[in-house]
Amino acid sequence: MIKTTLLFFATALCEIIGCFLPWLWLKRNASIWLLLPAGISLALFVWLLTLHPAASGRVYAAYGGVYVCTALMWLRVVDGVKLTLYDWTGALIALCGMLIIVAGWGRT
């Protein structure tokens, strides 16, 4: 389960970076060249999703819980926004959902 969770976090980071770089280009007039690493990051994101041994819908559902947590870490570290009790509570609930789904992978 730890390996799966770490893989999900790596996957989420690739997705967030792949979306953040075009956002910088569009919103902050950054270089159009940011689209190249963004595309690579998104391709890596898709490839990482294929490494899980479950049906794609289950992988996407479980991944969503980790994505929420990773996005909140990004909010804190990159955007510099302090997390609220609601952020922490939502992240905990999302992570619990992911753990429940992953725990059932070998039982179906």
UniProtKB/Swiss-Prot annotation:
Stretches that traverse the bilayer: 6-26, 31-51, 61-81, 85-105
GO cellular component: plasma membrane
Entries under InterPro entries matching the protein: UPF0060 (IPR003844)
Cytoplasmic side: 27-30, 82-84
Major subcellular site: membrane
Keyword Transmembrane helix: yes
UniProt record similarity statement: Belongs to the UPF0060 family.
HAMAP family: UPF0060 (MF_00010)
Name of the protein in its database record: UPF0060 membrane protein YnfA
Organism: Escherichia coli (strain K12)
Gene: ynfA
